A protein has these predicted regions:
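Nucleotide/pyrophosphate-binding catalytic subdomain
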Residues: 1-138
Length: 138
């Protein structure tokens, strides 16, 4: 596939609505096929605090227990993802939001650490390129 761009944005952009809007306008203007991968910044932590779910971070990495997994899924795959899709659509960039579980887009295994159990945190094993190719070609 010619001209496929895969761009990952992190919390620095996600947490700043002006930066996010400016980035998404620029991203929408890029010609060619593109995939945007995003995290959730501090929003998941703030939501967990509002819901009374204590968060554990070790060296900036989240320890994800069952309740935190629900919140992270809600925030990342729900609110943030759909906000990004809506903003891209408003900028005339046809967009679709997926999470890694959708269509087995991302296959992963539980993160193995010699001392620390990160809970429901995983490391990527494979990307379902066939699925992404079908979606990008439509």
């Amino acid at each position: 596939m010619a001209n496929l761009y895969v761009i990952k944005i992190g919390g620095n952009i996600i947490d700043d609505s002006a930066k996010l809007d400016a980035f998404l306008q620029s991203f929408a203007a890029v010609d060619g096929k593109k995939i945007l991968v995003h995290g959730g910044g501090k929003l998941a932590t703030r939501m967990a605090e509002k819901l009374g779910v204590e968060q554990q971070l070790v060296d900036g990495r989240r320890i994800t227990d069952a309740e935190t997994l629900k919140i992270v899924t809600m925030v990342y795959a729900g609110y943030i993802n759909k906000n990004i899709v809506a903003t891209l659509q408003a900028n005339h960039c046809n967009a679709m939001g997926l999470c890694g579980a959708d269509g087995d887009a991302i296959l992963a295994h539980k993160r193995n650490h010699p001392v620390l159990d990160y809970g429901y945190v995983g490391d990527v094993d494979a990307i379902n390129a066939d699925l992404l190719t079908v979606l990008l070609e439509k």
